[in-house]
Amino acid sequence: MLRNCRLFFIVLLSSFPLNGFDPSPEGVWRTIDDNTHKPRGLVRLYEQDGAVFGKIEASLDPKEADQVCERCSGDRKNKRVVGMVVMRNMKKRGSEYAGGDILDPDTGQVYRCKFTLEDGGRKLVVRGFIGISLLGRSQTWLRQE
């Protein structure tokens, strides 16, 4: 009986996540269009030199598969959107990632950015803003993998 109780508590304790469990943002995320609310593309987040970056892996709209960023500036101007790094230099700060920027390939605008993982790492709430975070908009991306 005592052996069964010990076994029960071991199984019970091992089923709870550790306090230090912190899901990684790395992986493929499905973006959702702000207007249609339909899946729009896939963005792969990856770590490089201690920061998180995001690259567009695919467009889910066949009409946008060969789209170029005509409104972008600098080295992104007139480059294919698929394959483009749109999120740069995001660093972990407490429970969020911040300090980097995100590009809107439709407008060519670059915004300051922050994001948090929610729902056990299955959702990524991305906020792009100018100046202060209150002056911006958020999107929720869904983990693909």
Predicted regions and their residues:
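Central antiparallel beta-sheet cores of small beta-barrel/beta-sandwich binding domains
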Residues: 31-113
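N-terminal helix-cap/turn-to-beta initiation motif at the start of protein domains
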Residues: 18-28
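Short, compact, well-ordered microdomains
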Residues: 112-114, 122-125
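Short aromatic-glycine motifs in intrinsically disordered, low-complexity regions
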Residues: 72-78, 125-132
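Bacterial N-terminal signal peptides
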Residues: 8-16
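Bacterial N-terminal signal peptides that target proteins for export
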Residues: 1-8
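Edge beta-strand at a domain terminus
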Residues: 121-123, 129-145
